[in-house]
Structures are given as structure tokens and as C-alpha cells.
Amino acid sequence: MGLAGYYRRFVPNFSSIAKPLTRLLEKGVPFVWSGDCEVSYQSLKSKLVDAPILALPESGKRFTVYTDASRIGLGCVLMQEGRVIAYGSRQLRKHEGNYPTHDLELAAVVFALKSWRHYLYGEACDIFTDHKSLKYIFTQKELN
């Protein structure tokens, strides 16, 4: 998983696809290669050999960040003028599985901003999420 994980930013939904394989690497879990593992392996293999269509970021142009969260993981896409710059995803940590939905959605936003801070620092960007309660946070000038 190490080398495949290195390319995770170029594979959309990497963490969801790789979940059956990463479960095999958990401590105390017997290594049993199931049908889900085979499907996951073949899917990752095909996605890693296909060249992703990514664009280089252009300075001075506005970035757009799309985020989403589920009970499995966090995902995000960085775009500029409708072109994909990068993908990001990760599986939830054990304690994050207990988070309420609005916290998971906010965690996806934080994950995206941390992952792409080198692109976004000092730049204007639009952030899109599918959770309406986060709209309040983004419209406040000051948060306590």
C-alpha cells in the first residue's frame, strides 16, 4: 500500500477504493484475501496505470474546493476554472467514526485546506460542501 498511497492525490476516491486492502494491514486482523480485496486491488491497479488528467495551477486565478464526507472517509477536489488540479481523500480514524455529520463535513474542509495550503495561501477560493449548517460558519466574520 505504501507506493500506491504515494499516488493517492491523483486517484479520485482513493481511500474508499483502498479500504478493503488497508483493513488487512490493521494490527490483529488476520490476512484473508476476499473478493472485496481482489476488486479493490484490480480497481487501484487500473487507476494507477491510467494517466490522470490534471491541470497545473495558474497564479492569480480563483481556486474552487469541493469537499464531502461519509462514514468511511473524507474527500475533496481542488479545481481552477473547471479543471482538476488535485484530488484528496483519506479514511476516517477510529474516533472520527463517532463524529456527528456536521463535524465530519467540517473535517473534510479542514483536511482540504491543510492539504492544499501551499496552493491556497494568500489566494481567494470558493469552498463547496453539501452540508447546509456549515454555511453559517463560512458567512461569519468572527468565530468564538
Range-by-range predicted roles:
Residues 2, 21, 44, 68, ...:
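Mobile genetic element proteins and their domesticated derivatives, centered on retroelements
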Residues 4-7, 105-122:
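Metal-dependent nuclease catalytic cores in nucleic-acid-processing enzymes
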Residues 60, 73, 122-124:
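Short secondary-structure junction motifs
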Residues 62-69:
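Two-metal-ion RNase H-like nuclease active-site motif
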Residues 79-84, 95, 115-124:
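Secondary-structure transition/capping motifs at alpha-helix termini
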Residues 80-107, 132-142:
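A short, polar/acidic, helix/strand-boundary loop motif
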